[in-house]
Structures are given as C-alpha cells and as structure tokens.
Regions:
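Flexible "cap/lid" loop of the alpha/beta hydrolase fold
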Residues: 105, 109, 116-145
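Conserved alpha/beta-hydrolase "acid-adjacent" motif
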Residues: 218-224
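Conserved acidic catalytic loop of the alpha/beta-hydrolase fold
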Residues: 75-92
C-alpha cells in the first residue's frame, strides 16, 4: 500500500495529510493528539486501513504545525474545513479518535454539508472529572518541555499495560522522540481538550453517527462515550479490555467502522 504525504494551504501554513487509496468515496480520518504527529507513520497507517483503500480515497489529518496558545477545538475544526474546501471534498465519511472525535463533532455542527456519516471513537462532548485530571496533567507536564516525560504520562493513559508490553520495543523507541518545542504544542492541544464543550450545540448534528468507546478509558472515561451517544440519540458500541486508543488495540475496530458506513447508505 503506497501512502503519500501531501499538503494544502490553510491561511499562511501548510496543512499536511496522508493520502492513500483510489476509491470514488472520500474518507477523512482525524487523528487524536500526539507529541510528534503522524506524518512519519504514513505507511503504517495505510497498511492498517488497507480495507478502505479500494472503496475510498483516504485522507488522514493531524493539526496545523503552528498552534498559538488558546487555539480551540472549534479553531481546529475550521482549519480542517478549509482544507476540505481546498480539496473539493464534501459529504465525506469521517472517523475521529479522541481529540479527533471532538473536531468531528464541531465540524458536523459548523459545516454539516461536509459530513455524510461520522464515527466518533474514545471521545467526549464536554469535560468530566477524568478528562479534567488527564488533560491538566498532560498540559502541565508538557509545559516543563520534557518530551520523555510527556510520552510517559500519555502512553500510560492511552494504552493498556498488556499492549505496551506486547509492543515494548516500539514504545521504547517512541518514548525517546519529541522536542521541547513539540511539548509546547502538545500543551496547547491538551488545554483545547480540557475546555472543549459542545453540548449546547449537539442538536445541530444531523448526520448518522456511531460512537465507539471503551470501559476503563483512563483519558476520558467510558461514561463520556455513553453520554455522548445518549445526547446524540445514536448507535454506540462499548469495548472492554482495551485502552483509550482502542482503534489500535481492538482487532475488529476498522471492520466495525466500515460496516457502519455501509449501513448508512
């Protein structure tokens, strides 16, 4: 599977994204927050989502490279909307994990014509005690500009201990990545998650939605996914035995997503 890293201008910056597949339909994936971003993982991401490649042209977005202090999830959704407009994409199927799921919620509220169907995984529509504690810890750790510490506190919450042990070599390498400048950016992302609250506007989301969550989510709590689905009146699937990043841990995750898109046609 060949994956290409491309970019589209948004304001004065270049918004990078990973593209693969040659299908007639558009799938837009919005990644969760991370210290180093996802562009170096293009081939691995394309391999993981290979089942979508025949039916879809897949584009995977992170965030703009430069994020000023005070950048909000709504701002990030506006950046994504600008990128999709520039690419001529509308009525796409969307998949967002964690903060990516928050961005998709806001996009579906502000630019509903861009979204045909949405899968929101391990996300939330408003703060809760678990998310407040998590994002405060991540923000404050990142403000110390110590990438090893940021990786440690984030990996421990995102993945189960078993998954980290099974992928010990990969995590050992990843734990040493990042720069002090990327820590500052991570702090902005964490604060945007900490204060995100779109509950007053959720009724504006009219597209079909599948919420996927996991009991025992140490970042946002499983209850956050159940609450989001209840407010939207949509389908929800809750996993057990996996971590916050269930999209990486659950073997049937991607097939479940694809099946939902098919049901929405």
């Amino acid at each position: 599977m060949t994956a290409n890293v491309r970019s589209v201008p948004v304001g004065t910056q270049k918004y990078e994204y990973i593209e693969f597949g040659r299908g007639e339909k558009d799938l837009v994936v919005v990644a969760g927050m991370s210290l180093c971003g996802i562009m170096d993982q293009a081939e691995a991401i394309a391999a993981a989502y290979a089942m979508f490649a025949e039916e879809y042209t897949v584009r995977v977005f992170d965030r703009l490279p430069d994020l000023p202090v005070g950048k909000t999830v709504r701002d990030m959704a506006a950046d994504l909307a600008c990128a999709l407009d520039a690419l001529g994409i509308d009525r796409a199927d969307l998949l967002g994990t964690s903060q990516g799921g928050m961005i998709i919620q806001q996009l579906a509220i502000d630019r509903p014509e861009l979204v045909r169907a949405a899968v929101i995984s391990s996300s939330a529509c408003c703060p809760n005690p678990t998310s407040e504690e998590t994002f405060t810890l991540w923000r404050d750790t990142a403000l110390r500009r110590d990438p090893v510490a940021v990786n440690d506190v984030s990996f421990r919450r995102i993945y189960t201990e078993k998954f980290r042990e099974d992928c010990a070599n990969a995590f050992a390498a990843l734990s040493q990545t990042g720069t002090p400048e990327q820590c500052e950016r991570f702090a902005v992302l964490a604060e945007a998650c900490r204060v995100f609250d779109c509950t007053a506007e959720l009724q504006k989301i009219r597209c079909p939605v599948l919420v996927i969550g996991v009991w025992g989510d140490m970042v946002l709590s499983g209850k956050a996914s159940v609450d989001l689905a209840r407010r939207l009146g949509c389908e929800v699937h809750m996993y057990e035995g996996f971590g916050h990043c269930v999209c990486d841990e659950a073997p049937d995750f991607r097939q479940r997503v694809l099946d939902f898109y098919h049901r929405c046609r």
